[in-house]
Amino acid sequence: MLLLNYTQNFQLITFLLFPFINTFDYNCLKPTTTTTTSPTSSKLGFLNRSKSNSNININELKNKFLEQQQEGSISNIAGVATTQQNPSIVINSSSSSSSSSSHHPHHQKTPSNSSSNFNLIKASFNQIGVAFNNNISPRSNRKEKEKDKDKDHQDNSNINNINNINNNINNNINNNNNNNNNNNNNNNMHNPTSSSPSINNNLKGKNVASIIAANGANLNNSLSNLHQHVNNNSNNNLTNSFNSVSHNNISISSGGSALSYNYTQQLNQNGGSNNGSTSNSTSNSANNSLLSLASSINGNIGSDENGSNVMYGGDIASSYHSMSIDPLKSSTNTETIEIMVVGDELSNKARFISSFLNNGIGEDPTLEISTKKSIAIQSGAYNVNINTTVGQEEFWGINDVYYRSSQGFIFVYNVNSRESFLSFLKFRDKIIHEKGTENILMAMVGLTSPLINQESGEESCIREVTQQEAKRMADLYSCSFVELNSFGLDCEHQIQSIVTDLLGRITSGLSSTNNNNSGNNSNNNNGNSNGNSSNNNSNNNSTNNLNNSAILNESIAQSIEVLMLGDIFVGKTQIIQRLLGNPFQNAYKETTEWNRNVYQMTVNDVRYLLKIVDTCGLDIEETLNRERLVSTQGFIFVYSIASRESFLMIEQLRKKLSSIKSETKIPSVLIANKGDSLIRQVTFDEGSKMAQHLGSHYFEVSSMFSDDESIGRPFEQLLIDIQKSGNASGFEPSEIKKKGYLFKEGKKLKSMSKYFFKASRGNLSYCKNESNKSKVKSIQLSEQIQLAIPHNVHEKKDVWPFSIILDPVSKHSINLIASTEEERNAWIKAIKFNCFLEDITSNIIDDVVKSMVSEIASGVAGSGSNNGNNNGHLKRSDTTQQLNNSGSFINGINANKPVPNFSNLSISGGGSSNNSNNSTPMSSPYGSSNNFSSHLSQSTSSMSMSPQQQLQSVLLSSSNLSSSMNSSFSYSSSISSSYTDSMSGSPPDSNGQVFPQSPQLKKTLFQRTTSFSKGSKLK
């Protein structure tokens, strides 16, 4: 086997057949050639071989050769072919064991007077030692022989890849020849192509280093011919600069990556300005061929016991154009992508990274790992830098740096540990917090290998996370998902695919962003040259962007966070697991910390991502604080029908929530669990009354026997309640005005009296009886007034107190009590609205008056363009738009509620003009159109008028103003007919003017606008 494995060249065979011969005549090694001069016979001397050195003494062989060259006689060495065009080495792999010279290939006879050929042969000697070292390295270890069998299949694929690269380069040259012939019919050019011989399959069993050394000449030939072809045709078709692959380098190291096929691109400035696409396509094809070679060779050199790539025999570097490059250095155009692997201590993150990098980290990982590996994908070659912090999960300052700098994340967990799986949301929240965005690219990897108990050493194969649950979690957060049996070398290909897929998602996002930016820049450039056409394109692009964003918003689900509250042992976790589709677990496992679970649900054609927070029942009241509940939108109270203590704890939890949450109405449901229990301590009626007291819906289920529909019904009802509370966008007319009976606390403590209250028009009035309003007391509501719910008062049955704080400094307040919680919420909502009603009305009036002035200004422009036309019409679209935009002040009340729609307002009015020059009735909403147009035309034509005269050109009818104010409050007039009575005009005075009756309104109007008496005439 040793002889069969090392039959690379004849010199090696003779060396093995005669190991004890001290002298050897090398005349038989001279090739048979036909020359004019007779060949000179010479001896190269002795070949020394010691036990400590199994390689041929190349230095001694080289010295013999140099001595003969000085004498004028040169002999070629068997197994080495040198040509003038390509001085690379071709190792003859087809040598037989026979000593006959006819079995050897013929070599070129080099003249003794050729110094250039001598330099070529001398340069070839520098590579003989490396080539022989790889060919005759002894493999005495049986394990290495077994590994050689496994490498046969990989070496065959590498041989085919190298052949394909040569064929691709030759095809690219032929394509260029065809293009040149089509463009230059009169010029028949001879395009040099490389006839790359096929690689001998007898190299099977050798490492990739020997394959590259044996076939490097073919690749160099192809690349040099391609370079020469580009230079010859630079003046015809190849106009742009050609990225020639003139320095292709092959280097092997035993450290990080196994084999890096690095090449540097040189820009050759070529003339011409015709067709440059051919040059670019040829260069890209050559680059892609080299990238495919790098990806095919990478990782197939060999590996030691730890999985790291090693060399057999030494390093190889091709000497073409004095090539040498550091394998750790990459091209300047290669981009680095940061990827971080996250997970808890049970996920075996270090082994995952070790299998991907194949660098021998193994079972002894460092505390901080930062390793790069080059990956070639369709979009190009990238340096993937994988980071993780094994053992530093508690040091958030270190992890934050990795979170912010990483572009993609890989979450690994163990399927036999639910705690390991639930840490996904914890890590994702931290990443979102650090990066400031929810647009995160992640991959989820599940490890199915058994857990090993560190104390007992026993393996645990009890699966706690189903594949369906993990797949659902991955789909909700747009993560790729895969499960692996192990993170060893047997799954290296799958791990490589996971990282490659994530890299493709990252680079596609970056390329789409760059394409959008370049597209916008190109549209702008085209706009400068093409004019209107570019504007149309930009409008179309903006329309498409709006449509895409609308589709994206529709596809994005709303996120709702729900909190499960209840005593210990009531079954909160089992209800969540049944909702997620997992079976009931008989074994009890206490929940020691708050865990998040995500469930997707569609209610009323709206898709929700329900984030269900499972709380620990032990000391739940102490763990509830404002920071934990700030993002919670709904609550689920759970108690056990077999435990009255858990039932009584619901009231304590409700009071705790009421003291923390500022909302008066908190969406919640009440679930009575363990309905299958024979020991019942809480009846169904008691649970129903508790739910009525909470203002919630009541459900009684069994986490063991209830079906999936019964388990999911409480969550669906909670989402409906959240929808209702969220859809209360803006105050309805029935909520603005509120009247009814409330109990008011008297001067004496605990002295409650029943009064009739009415909240409307920014006032809160109350009296003893609704029919007798002789003694009515009123409170002016303003934004300084606050409302609060006293939580320190012991609430009795049908008692729902709340306080109106009139003076926060002196703490003067009025304590009121409603009969039901819904009644109390309605009163609080109505009082809040009326507290801000004064600001609302002033802002409405401000916007209405500004809109009227803008309409007058538009009428000025219209009358000026009509040259005195008396039939000018005023635009109302601007008024409607501004009124729709007005009311943003309501956001101060509730930022989540949209403003009322005033699009149905109609500002109109009538009146007569007292001008003696024109007694025609007014057809314009703001006065006589004839007189109005004439004054406006004069104001636009005469620019020498004083500012006072220019202001007097605006004739604002107070009667029309009052009527427009009445119409602007049509939204409020639907509440009560008396609401707009105060806004109606008083009887006209001697001048026929009508002013609003409200002093505050009149003051606001005259502060913000300038109105003058009608009939004034410009001089």
Curated annotation (Swiss-Prot):
Main location: membrane
A Pfam family that the UniProt record links to this protein: PH
Residues covered by region (Disordered): 89-118, 131-202, 265-287, 512-546, 860-890, 904-951, 977-1019
Compartment annotation: Cell membrane
Bias-annotated ranges (Polar residues): 879-890, 987-1019
Domain of life: Eukaryota
Effect of a null allele: Display directionality defects during chemotaxis and increased motility.
One Gene Ontology term, aspect cellular component: plasma membrane
Coiled-coil regions, chain positions: 158-188
Keywords noted in UniProt: Cell membrane, Coiled coil, GTP-binding, Membrane, Nucleotide-binding
Keyword set includes Zinc: no
GO terms assigned for molecular function: GDP binding; GTP binding; GTPase activity
Keyword Cell membrane set for record: yes
Biased segments, Basic and acidic residues type: 141-155
Start-end of Low complexity biased regions: 93-102, 158-202, 860-872, 977-986
GO term, biological process aspect, one: chemotaxis to cAMP
Domain PH: from-to ranges: 735-836
Biological role: Component of the Sca1 complex, a regulator of cell motility, chemotaxis and signal relay. The Sca1 complex is recruited to the plasma membrane in a chemoattractant- and F-actin-dependent manner and is enriched at the leading edge of chemotaxing cells where it regulates F-actin dynamics and signal relay by controlling the activation of rasC and the downstream target of rapamycin complex 2 (TORC2)-Akt/protein kinase B (PKB) pathway.
PANTHER family referenced in this protein's UniProt entry, alphabetically: RAS, DI-RAS, AND RHEB FAMILY MEMBERS OF SMALL GTPASE SUPERFAMILY
Assembly with partners or alone: Component of the Sca1 complex composed of at least gefA, gefH, scaA, phr, and the protein phosphatase 2A subunits pppA and pho2B. Interacts directly with gefH.
Protein name: Sca1 complex protein phr
